Design a protein with these regions (language model features):
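Gly-rich Lys/Arg/Thr-decorated short loops/hinges at beta-loop-alpha junctions or inter-strand turns
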Residues: 5-12, 71-85, 144-154, 184-185, ...
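C-terminal non-catalytic interaction/assembly regions of soluble proteins
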Residues: 259-422
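Short glycine/serine/threonine-rich phosphate/pyrophosphate-binding segments
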Residues: 18-28, 52-53, 94-97, 117-125, ...
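Accessory alpha-helical/coil subdomains and C-terminal extensions
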Residues: 102, 113-115, 121-136, 140, ...
């Protein structure tokens, strides 16, 4: 086949999903459909890169235009995601060769990998081995992570909606606690995601507008946890405000690097498995002060809450999907679309790009000047950064009082290769 003929594209979702990753999928698919001179069919990996390895591919052309359009307002990963990190090329060349074999069998010339830090690394490695094996493949990393820790982009699609959920939940829960504090609950602890970066925890700070407003304490991974200082601040808050609302990142740790809630296990990417910092902190307070408490873990709720998604986040998620295809057909390879902030007030942004070599495996943490001097709150500079990202509402359609989310048919592509044994 002539290499000037249109080739197929493969889209895959990776890692933890978000409220808007499907909007990115819609951006990729709808834009690819408009570039018939370059792209023939769009395929998707069922459960991400695992589907690609197992030649378990979905024919997206079998989905209706209404379903693809409906992805814009549907949370989670419509095509299935996976926590599966490819090892280095030298460590497990067979996996990379298998992917190229699958690409060759299905004439896949474009690969769009929608994920976070590790996914950008995988896309970069694939672009390299494609060259080594003499198979031309355009690899574009498409940004997605609620943790907001990818470098070279002002923000990451998925973060704005989580930030909005956490800010709203913090404000609403604080009103509840304030109502009950006289005779009942004095402390409320909300545990949010964020293994090493405190962006999501910082978003809780948007719930308050003036001094004394909740949350009264935010615990960031970037600030070493000091038990005595923390307990003193809790007591001060209860004595002056009548109650205390705390937002704690799952990655909060002591000065020696020990996580407050280290479960002693790792996930498929090799990251420490965390969970349970909320009750750890709450019990610490009860033992020290005897206050009645409630704690909650936002967990999957924070990243699945499409009903309260940020309009800006939805728009940016679609935009990076669209830009990924436009970069690919323009001849770019091993790059990632980025969000570029032009101004904060009024908020203006555009789409740029960065090379995967720059982005891969780099983690962006919350800057120190975004955290107050005492380490328990956010600064005005942080607020200026965060506020535009949660702006606007993009409600899904409702039927019978519930969001009308779509589900794909997921028609599989006929396999051409023998099974792959991992």
């Amino acid at each position: 086949m002539s290499r000037t003929a249109p080739r197929n594209a493969l889209y895959a979702q990776s890692g933890g999903v978000t409220a808007v990753i499907n909007a990115t999928a819609a951006g990729v698919i709808e834009t690819a459909m408009r570039h018939k001179r370059h792209i023939d069919k769009v395929l998707a990996g069922r459960h991400g890169i695992v589907g690609a390895l197992e030649e378990d591919l979905i024919d997206v052309s079998k989905e209706s235009r209404e379903t693809i359009r409906g992805l814009r307002h549907t949370p989670a990963g419509a095509f299935g995601s996976a926590r599966f990190k490819l090892k280095g090329i030298d460590q497990n060349r067979a996996e990379y060769e298998r992917l190229i074999e699958v690409f060759r069998a299905h004439d896949i010339g474009y690969f769009f990998y929608n994920g976070g830090n590790d996914s950008m690394d995988t896309a970069h490695k694939l672009s390299q081995i494609g060259e080594q094996l003499g198979y031309p493949i355009t690899c574009i990393g498409v940004p997605k992570t609620v943790d907001n820790d990818l470098p070279f982009t002002d923000c990451c699609p998925g973060f704005g909606s989580v930030a909005k959920y956490v800010a709203v939940s913090t404000r609403e829960a604080a009103l509840d606690v304030a109502s009950m504090a006289k005779t009942s609950t004095k402390v409320f602890v909300l545990e949010v995601m964020g293994r090493h970066a405190g962006w999501i925890a910082a978003a809780g700070g948007l719930a308050g507008r003036k001094a004394g407003d909740p949350p009264h304490i935010i615990l960031f991974p970037e600030i070493a946890f000091d038990r005595e200082r923390f307990l003193a601040r809790v007591k001060q808050s209860v004595e002056t405000q009548g109650y205390c609302v705390i937002v704690v990142s799952e990655g909060s740790a002591t000065a020696d690097g020990k996580f407050l809630a280290d479960a002693g296990t790792t996930d498929a990417f090799g990251h420490t498995q965390l969970g349970g910092v909320g009750p750890v902190v709450a019990n610490m307070i009860r033992e020290a002060h005897g206050y009645k408490y409630h704690w909650a873990v936002a967990d999957y709720l924070q990243r699945a809450a499409r009903h309260i998604a940020s309009k800006v986040d939805v728009e940016q998620a679609y935009a990076v999907g669209k830009a990924a295809v436009e970069l690919a057909v323009a001849g770019h390879n091993a790059v990632m679309p980025t969000i570029v902030r032009k101004s904060s007030r009024p908020y203006r942004w555009t789409v740029g790009s960065a090379t995967l070599a720059e982005v891969a495996n780099v983690e962006r943490k919350l800057p120190r000047d975004y955290i107050t001097e005492d380490g328990f709150g956010i600064t005005a500079k942080c607020r200026r950064y965060l506020e535009p990202l949660i702006a606007g509402e993009a409600y899904p359609p409702y039927v019978d009082g519930l969001p009308a989310y779509v589900r794909i048919k997921g028609v599989g592509v006929k396999k051409k290769l023998p099974p792959f044994k991992r």
